[in-house]
Amino acid sequence: MTIAGSDTLAGGGLQSDLKTFEDYHLFGLTAITCIAVVKNGQFAITNLPTELLNDQLNTIKDNLSLDGIKLGLIHQLESLEIVKSFLRSFDGPIVLDPVMAFKETDHVYNDSYREKLIELFPFATVITPNLKEAELLSQQKISNPTEMEQAAKKIIDLGAQSVVIKGGQRLSGNLASDLFYNSETFQYFSKPKLSNVTINGAGCTFASAIAANLVLGKDLVNAIEDSKEYVYQGIKNGLLLKNGEGNVWFGDSVKSEVMT
């Protein structure tokens, strides 16, 4: 299942999670935390009442068995506490995408949110911050692989079992490299950088693909490797929007290239 926000443009959020689960032939469930829209040209988030989030989680817990959980945007401190309580009764794979910064806006979350989010780390099999989020969590700048490794160590020290820092386009060079660290081993996953603007939802899709792969029995390293390729194909085959941006999308291409 995914516990995440709803993206009205369906590039990221629970919409991309469900599409990813479907590509991996898994039945996806949702608990919605908030709704993201574009209002007067500005990115805006409306929270759902925390009681409603709790009701959604209880509905799932009382009626279904879960094989894996992906955590996305959990916008309120009270919601983080509700989710933490829910995770205590689950012992399967959990992938946490620690959403703290957005491409669409300069908004970032405050220290109180950071501290509450960190309380979820021990429950997660792996967390998947982008560079900005890794900087916020580790409280250091990241401008090269050495600093990325330093940040990964600090994130593990916060209680994470393992972390994948998504390098994206920001670091120099021709490769988009993600760094995996589990307190023992560093491993890079790299693909050639793409110039495509169809990147909305890449982070959400990456995390939900890892969750899907773990549910299907892959070990964590192979799950990350497969998910990296899956997202790469989604960016290559993405859907352009009227505003000049675009969503990750796969069509029929990804199933033949990745799902074999």
Regions found by a protein language model. Give the residues of each.
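Short pre-catalytic strand/loop immediately N-terminal to key active-site residues, enriched for Gly-Thr
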Residues: A4-L9, F186-N200
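Conserved phosphate/ATP/ADP-binding segment of small-molecule kinases
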Residues: N110-T185
